[in-house]
UniProtKB/Swiss-Prot annotation:
Belongs to the methyltransferase superfamily. RsmC family. Specifically methylates the guanine in position 1207 of 16S rRNA in the 30S particle. Its EC number is 2.1.1.172. PANTHER family: RIBOSOMAL RNA SMALL SUBUNIT METHYLTRANSFERASE C. It comes from the Bacteria. This is Ribosomal RNA small subunit methyltransferase C. It is found in: Cytoplasm. Monomer. It comes from Pseudomonas fluorescens (strain Pf0-1). It catalyses: guanosine(1207) in 16S rRNA + S-adenosyl-L-methionine = N(2)-methylguanosine(1207) in 16S rRNA + S-adenosyl-L-homocysteine + H(+). Its main location: cytoplasm. It is an enzyme of class 2 (transferase).
Length: 332
């Protein structure tokens, strides 16, 4: 069981009523708290929770409509996402309790200060390298629309400026990361047909490709509901239409693709995790048509080339710079 859940269960008597678990892990916590309900924005965790506790977790970027008497927020990685989630639950809980739980290495001690606008926070427990904080909501805020927290920036592309809408919690929030910047410079000679932006984040690559290749079908895929929402906003801001999907990795992608583009993630929260990318490299051939192309950017220190050649075919380094490389391979 996740150590954060174990800390909650040390105080299980506090969580026996109708409690919302925001950002909960995919463990047995719902089984131990029979009246609790989850709010999840990670598609993989949601699928695991649905398989074990069908109908007891809500997936998306907005707080569930159902009523709840208290809420536990599992500390997200991003400070602005924490603010959004805390605001969303506290706006529904005037005079009642909000709890914040997280690992010490995730910054829970500092994050506890984000409870200050609602009342006087206090530490209830510290165990398993985690802390549990509580506040009684004396100052219930007005709920903030998620779009009001978006950051917007423009990219000067050859086809004209591209407006990017980034929501809290999305990778490289409010700015273009160096890997995507390099890949944007090397979108030439992509195949016609169906293109996938894998791990789309705010939709930068998918929108740029749709702008440059308007007759191609473009799909954007991410595991995170906030990323998918950002991508939809980015597409709409530029008058572009493309399919946006949430799903856990390449297994959620369509078949028969002509190209897969990616600046793949290798962090989950504060943890390093290469599984999604390595799984992409192992299974890309299954999702690509014959002659279909994989084009991805990654940190130069990540040795992806042998894995690509093992599972897809000859892999070339198309470009490199600023500590990143672009790999290109075709399904033979």
């Amino acid at each position: 069981m996740d150590p954060r859940s174990e800390v909650l269960l040390r105080q299980a008597e506090l969580f026996q009523g109708s409690v919302l678990l925001a950002g909960l892990p995919a463990d047995d916590l719902l089984g131990r708290l029979p009246d609790a309900f989850g709010w999840c924005w990670h598609a993989g965790d949601q699928a695991a929770l649905d398989a074990r506790f069908e109908g007891r977790s809500h997936f998306g970027v907005n707080v569930p409509e159902r009523s709840f008497d208290t809420a536990v927020v599992f500390l997200p990685k991003a400070k602005d996402l924490t603010d959004y989630i805390l605001n969303a639950v506290a706006s529904r809980l005037a005079g009642r309790e909000v709890y914040l739980v997280g690992e010490k290495r995730s910054g829970i001690e500092g994050a506890s200060k984000q409870l200050n606008p609602f009342g006087k926070p206090r530490k209830l427990d510290s165990a398993r390298h985690c802390q549990l904080w509580q506040v009684t909501v004396a100052n219930a805020p007005e709920a903030k629309p998620l779009e009001s927290l978006a950051q917007t920036y423009e990219l000067p592309l050859a086809e004209g400026p591209l407006k990017v809408i980034s929501l809290p919690g999305v990778f490289s929030h409010g700015r273009l990361d160096r890997g995507s910047a390099l890949l944007l410079e090397h979108l030439d000679k992509l195949p016609s047909g169906h293109l996938l932006d894998f791990g789309c984040g705010a939709g930068v690559l998918g929108a740029a490709v749709k702008r440059r290749y308007p007759h191609n079908q473009v799909t954007l895929l991410d595991v995170d509901a906030f990323a998918a929402a950002s991508s939809r906003l980015t597409l709409a801001a530029n008058g572009l239409e493309a399919e946006v999907l949430t799903g856990d990795g390449i297994d959620a992608a369509p078949m028969g693709l002509n190209a897969i583009l990616s600046n793949p993630p290798f962090h989950v929260g504060v943890h390093t995790d290469y599984f999604a990318t390595e799984n992409l490299l192992r299974k890309a051939a299954k999702h690509l048509k014959n002659g279909g192309e994989l084009r991805l950017v990654a940190n130069s220190f990540l040795k992806y080339q042998p894995l690509i050649e093992e599972h897809l075919g000859v892999c070339a380094i198309k470009a490199e710079g600023n500590g990143f490389r672009i790999y290109r391979a075709k399904r033979g």
